[in-house]
Amino acid sequence: MKKSNIIIIILSLLLTGIVGYGLGKQASSRPVEQTVNNATTFEHWNEDSEALKELIAYVEDVTDENSENFIPAVDRVATFDMDGTLMAELCPTYIGVKMLMERIFNDPSYEADEEMREFGLMMRDHAMDKSFPSDFDYTFSSHEAKAFAGMSLNEYSDYVTGFLLNDADGFENMIYGNAYYLPMVEVIDYLQDHDFKCFIVTGSDRFFIRTFIEGVIDVPYENIIGSDVELEAKDQGDTENYVYEFTGKDTLVRTDKLIIKNIKTSKVLQIAQEIDRKPVLSFGNSSGDVSMHNYTITNNGYKSAAFQLIADDDVRDYGNSSKGKELRDKWEGMGFVAVSMKNDWKTIYGENVVKTGSFHWLEDYADE
């Protein structure tokens, strides 16, 4: 599973030019191995991590056929947020924001209008201190939809693939395509080995995440639920979908119409519509995931749990260690298991990845 993302990216470009749709691990009826060797299964976690112990105890309980808390494999559903839960969001901001900035200011094939450039400048000025306007989550995705409108799905995948080859701002020895949390990839592998069906439920663009996880996170593409833009046939024009007849010569393209921003209660609605089973495990890191957590642990017919990551590592990442206790108290008070990136993980991105302590963000997008 742990193939190098860069190899996958290069092979994708050279051999196919598109991102393929793979199949994930399927549930089986094989007996569950109850003994976990932390040194090999969770080599990126500290062995004394209480959060890890709680996760292992939970899984061993609900996969034991003799336990009163046994959950049949068909109902073992785990949902994961993406940004800040499986991949970096502090270099210096969301990776999707960085890609949109590149599209607006550094892509010669795209001519941003004045309103788009103004939005880009706003992102530039607020990214460093995370002081985005309160409606930023939605307005970002609506501008993202506009910036990539007209691209076919393959063209968009290729664009994302090329962007992911760029060096991650604020780090040495890491490209954006490798900016994922190694300990959390181990969690997905572990759960799938115990017949859990893992879903990524993210506020990021669904197709962006499909490309990002290729060769990194072994989750089937159909198990990715994200923010969506409307698609249409390239030559469809103003004809409604229920009228237009798709032909073998047609190509699907992205439009500038945002269908859904998949955060907060939208995540709950999407889970109900697309999975049709309530999760028994939920993993997130922010207020945007609280609704998904509450949906998981409230009125569930099975034993359930929610895990909330805390970005408190200011040595290996750009977290805020001073807020660690405050956030732990907050999340545990809501019934979630708190995971400290600082104290629970041996590494975040790998020992060779080094935090530089500075960003090129402002100089990259300085006024001309």
Where are these regions (language model features)?
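Non-catalytic pre-domain segments flanking phosphatase-related domains
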Residues: 5-82, 90-91, 97, 104-110
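C-terminal cap/substrate-recognition subdomain and adjoining C-terminal extension
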Residues: 27-45, 60, 68, 158-368
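Short, structured coil/loop segments at alpha-helix boundaries
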Residues: 48-53, 68, 93, 110-124, ...
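Electropositive phosphate-/nucleotide-binding environments in soluble metabolic enzymes
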Residues: 49, 150, 265
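Short amphipathic alpha-helical patches
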Residues: 81-83, 106-110, 123, 214-215, ...
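A metal-dependent, Asp-based hydrolase signature
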Residues: 91-92, 97-177
